[in-house]
Amino acid sequence: FTFWYTADFFSSNNAWRTQIASYRLSGGFANDVGVNAITQPENGILTNAETVEISIRNFGSAPQSNIPLELRVDGNLVASETFTGTILENETANYTFTQTVDLSASGQTYSIEAKTALVGDEFTANDPFTKEVTNLLSNDVGAIEITAPVSGTGLGNETISVNLKNFGALPQSNFDVQYVIDGGTPVVETFTGTINSEEEVVYNFTQTADFSALGTYNIT
């Protein structure tokens, strides 16, 4: 069904304008399936034989079975397999590819695409699902932002605050953190907490810095 409606609104010159538009209600498709999630693998220390697990959804009204599947890594087809079960209308099913994938290069981000290839699929735009997965380094932590102090008036002895992130796969604790102002002597302290993989935390240095003199300061 197509519905037409008219709306009045103010234009940029404060004059009334009329807009005529339409929208359509559709009963959907009988044959329409697609991959709606890639649940495995996740970011971490990965190997040359990683299992790929996906979720398949039946978006259509007709039950579907024997659904062809394709698996790609960085655009390269690595597997063509078949889901042999049956998925009812608007339901999902999990599938694990028999073919594993090589994600063993440390520090590399891979693009994984899983796709249905149902013959007669009436809406193919929702067939594929893509996920980026990174093979994290074991130990990789760094400062991503200095959040304090900020430019302003009336500055004095100010606390230096930084956001730290664990980019690696292993939890990190008891590591040195430092700041330097205008290329001077580094102020080194120890972060005694624990940052889990891909987690961010705020660290406030105990030793403050003097910003009372007018001017621009470079903090690294």
Regions found by a protein language model. Name each.
Residues 1-28:
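Beta-propeller fold recognition
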Residues 28-220:
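Extracellular/luminal regions of secreted and cell-surface proteins that mediate adhesion/ECM remodeling
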